[in-house]
Amino acid sequence: VYKRQVLFDFGLSSPQLDNASRGFSFRLEAPLDMRMDNSQGLSAKEWLQTVEEEELAKVIRDFGEERYFKRVAHAIVSYRQQKPIETTKELASVISKVVKVKERGLHPATRTFQAIRIKINQELKEIECVLPEVLDLLSPNGRLVSIAFHSLEDRIVKRFLQENSKPISLPKWVMMKESELGLSPLKILGHPVKASSEEVALNPRARSAIMRVAEKVARK
């Protein structure tokens, strides 16, 4: 069954973040879990207890875009040699001792928590896998709407839309339009949209949200 519209709202939901037992928030004391599905895979606590320092640093750098990734990785590994990191606030405390934050309102543990969560749940791989499936789901002129909350998610969406909406130059002797050849399945609509100041005032978590919209090209 074709869909007229597919909406992706990537990342954590507020109920997940505000549920202390899930272990996503550094502001709420809880067991260090971070799994979207806590019946599958390693918890953040289990992963942090065994991961090599070099791999941990790479995860924090690539998925958290943390400037002090080496410093944080070393602090975590050094701490765990004394005892396992059991809770969210315990991990946040370890990170806070080695990270200097210049951005107003940003907690020192923000980027590292994001990185570990993305790694534990394979979030970016999930996005890369699901986006191509939309091409078969959408009806002609159907809309793909994506809302991403950080640059890593948005980068994947942006690249996917660009790759599937590239204009193709046809030789002059080809007496057909691009739309008739079944090329470029998507058309990007408008520019990326960010939350207004009014919306951010009502929902501060929307401050980093970016929405992109594309339409499936109807074939003749």
Predicted features, each with a name:
Residues 3-220:
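S-adenosyl-L-methionine-dependent methyltransferase catalytic core, i.e., the SAM/SAH-binding region
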